[in-house]
């Protein structure tokens, strides 16, 4: 089964931008709020489309949804994860299936997302869990491409997705003990550095005392 290229013109039309042009039984996905530059660039590989960081995200330790305005960024601490809502809203026909994979350029920085799927018939924005497996804090700006979407053809007999699209909802409120543990996890690097600094200071003072 081959990958369907992202094309906005016949005879390989696979992407449309308006509800009027979308056909539920067709073979073109509807992408609203698209990055047109990706789709119009003749030198860009059109086997994938890079989904972008949208205007909402949620830290996996936090029970509130956080807004992300133009020019702002998400700071991903080492070992941390966030659920990012995509800038794009999609609507899939019954003839296409979507697969979401990490971007190689971000993997080199330790940033990876959970591989996800988009069923035929799905309509809505996408929520992508993204991790920082690296050792440094990394930033993802609003409208940065952070994961890659692949299109795959679907054979006859498929039962389309028939449920509301995804949206951010608050997580259950954690206990005081869990919040304390989360606080320690987030600041683990700084706490480790602080202990190391105090230890070194103690050693230096001891050496100075001996030399005197």
Regions found by a protein language model. Name each.
Residues 1-212:
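DUTPase catalytic domain/fold
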